[in-house]
A protein has these predicted regions:
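N-terminal amphipathic, basic-rich helices that act as targeting or association modules
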Residues: 1-5
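Non-transmembrane, aqueous-exposed alpha-helical and coiled segments at domain scale
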Residues: 8-57, 61, 67-301
Length: 301
């Protein structure tokens, strides 16, 4: 696991992408400079300027993920130019590999588990109307692919680090087509969702909003009599909703044990929205993301 942080990111998206690619090259090059290699005779070569205390280890691969998901070709290009023994097999995906998002590998695998859980309850998530809440957005690999696996789901609420999406009574068919449109749109966000396709009382809001006026439909959806709630309070209410499925397709830990403190979870960004396992009322949790629940919360649920 590793990564880098861009400082003074340009406001323009295209400039930001160019800058991130430039520094990604530096990042990958720096890693390869201190990594053991294998020569054409099959012998391990250790970089001469590196002091090592462990055994030779020339096996290094990268799996570009969120933020760098389209950078596989860059990593492989750097690998080949550096003479690294894996060449263009260094990074997964890319133009000569498989595209995680295009193939939907993670989401499809996770959805098989969802189908199994529902079948054990005598239901078919592929044909039965199924109410869903989710973490993520349609531009994402796991969330986006997951929310296209069934045409009979009703995605009633979702959120990511920026936005909150509320759709109290969605039409399964038209909402599926709209999600597909967003999935195919480059860099879409929840704000790109056609407002005329959102059911009465719903909408898209900022997660950091100081106050969101709640319609009667949303009050009923969230189970509250409050007239207004902060964005983070709405997110908490979403996680507490009584629905069929919670689809975890975004980064963060959102459910912990009652016995755990926020400090023990180690995900400060979501401290204000996280719920305890005793507050979780969904029938099935589908996790295509990573660490959506703490281990103790999993055991309790």
């Amino acid at each position: 696991k590793g990564g880098f942080v861009l400082k003074n990111t340009p406001a323009e998206r295209e400039e930001a992408i160019l800058k991130s690619k430039k520094h990604y090259r530096r990042f990958i090059s720096a890693m390869l400079e201190i990594t053991d290699n294998i020569d054409v005779q099959g012998k391990v070569q250790t970089p001469g300027h590196v002091i090592t205390y462990d055994d030779p280890d020339p096996y290094l691969v990268v799996a570009p993920d969120k933020g760098t998901a389209d950078f596989s070709d860059i990593a492989n290009e750097v690998s080949e130019k550096s003479g690294f023994w894996l060449g263009d097999a260094f990074a997964s995906g890319g133009s000569i590999g498989y595209d995680h998002r295009k193939e939907g590998i993670t989401a499809r695998g996770g959805w098989e588990c969802v189908k199994l859980h529902f079948s054990e309850m005598g239901r078919n998530v592929q044909t039965d109307t199924t109410s869903v809440i989710g973490v993520g957005d349609m531009s994402g690999d796991v969330f986006g692919n997951g929310m296209l696996q069934s045409k009979t789901i009703q995605l009633k609420a979702a959120f990511n680090h920026m936005h909150i999406f509320l759709d109290p009574d969605p039409d399964p068919e038209s909402s599926w087509h709209e999600r597909k449109r967003l999935f195919e749109m480059q860099g879409s966000t929840w704000t790109d969702y056609s407002t005329n396709l959102i059911s009465s009382g719903g909408g898209v809001y900022e997660r950091q909003a100081k106050s969101i006026e709640l319609s009667p439909e949303v009050k009923d959806l969230l189970g509250t009599d409050e007239e207004n709630l902060k964005g983070i309070e709405v997110v908490r209410r979403i996680l507490q909703m009584d629905v069929d499925l919670l689809w975890l397709g975004g980064i963060g830990t959102f459910i912990k044990s009652d016995l755990e403190s926020e400090f023990h979870v180690g995900d400060q960004a979501n401290n204000e929205v996280r719920i305890n396992s005793s507050e979780c009322r969904v029938n099935v949790i589908g996790e295509g993301a990573n660490l959506g629940l703490t281990q103790l919360a999993r055991i309790e649920l």
